[in-house]
Amino acid sequence: MPEFILGARGHDFGRHDPETLFSSIGQAGFACTQLAFTKAVEGVKSYADVTPALVERARTAAAASGVGIAVDGTYVELSYADEDKRHAEAAKVLSQIPVARALGAGCMGSETTNMAKQPGVTRREAQEALLRSLGEILPACEEQGVLFAVECVYYHAMNTPEAVRMVLDTMASPNLRVICDFANYVGPEAASVDAQRRIWDKVGSWYGDKITAVHFKGQNFQPDGTLYSTSLEDSCVD
């Protein structure tokens, strides 16, 4: 049985300097975190603000607090069909690979792209763009010994277990992993327990060994299918 280490997202604690952020996470009883500099660290508005000095402060603060960095969150738009936009987003990830390595992060992580952000683009086109982005990112990750994980979301480009398996099989990279947020697989049409179990069976049997981080959150759906957040107790997620 694999050992699970309980953590929390850094930006759920608000924006702070690295020392305050990691101290707060550790004092809350968590052993690791998902650190997204652009969401959790004061003064960071873009990846250009993630300087070597700031990275060293974060590394030192993490070590002092006993909080590991499980995921270096580099959440960008990997599935833009517009090549100029897509290439710019992939470049952001490439700039952060040395950061993840310096931090000793378990992996880097990103979702793909919300389909609503590019009307008129088909999911197949968005997935092909995702593969092109990963084709730029993964060779650099392999060279520098960093894992890169993608996260499935049912309204994004990579939206089903079938899509995840396609990406893993197509890229065939030893450094490609999966972040699994169970809630993100569940749309209103698959909210029943039986439907969810069919999803979980696919996730576990097809690529369970590729899952490097798991997220938990609560959600449910209004009668019209509108998504809303809940506690874990009130969640429709089985």
For each of these PLM feature ranges, what is it?
Residues M1-H16:
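Boundary/entry segment of secreted carbohydrate-active catalytic domains
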Residues E19-T20, S24, E56-R57, A61-S65, ...:
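Active-site acidic/histidine proton-transfer and metal-coordination neighborhood
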Residues Q34-R59, T112-P119:
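Glycine-rich, proline-tolerant flexible connector loops at the mouths of alpha/beta enzymes
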Residues D12-G14, F37-K39, Y75-L78, T112-K117, ...:
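Active-site-proximal loop/turn and secondary-structure-junction residues that shape catalytic pockets
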Residues T33, E125, R132-C236:
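Acidic/histidine-rich catalytic cores of soluble enzymes
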Residues A31, G68, G106, T212:
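Short acidic/polar active-site loop segments enriched in Thr and Asp
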Residues P2-L6, S24-F30:
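A short, Lys/Arg-enriched amphipathic alpha-helix followed by its capping loop at the start of a domain
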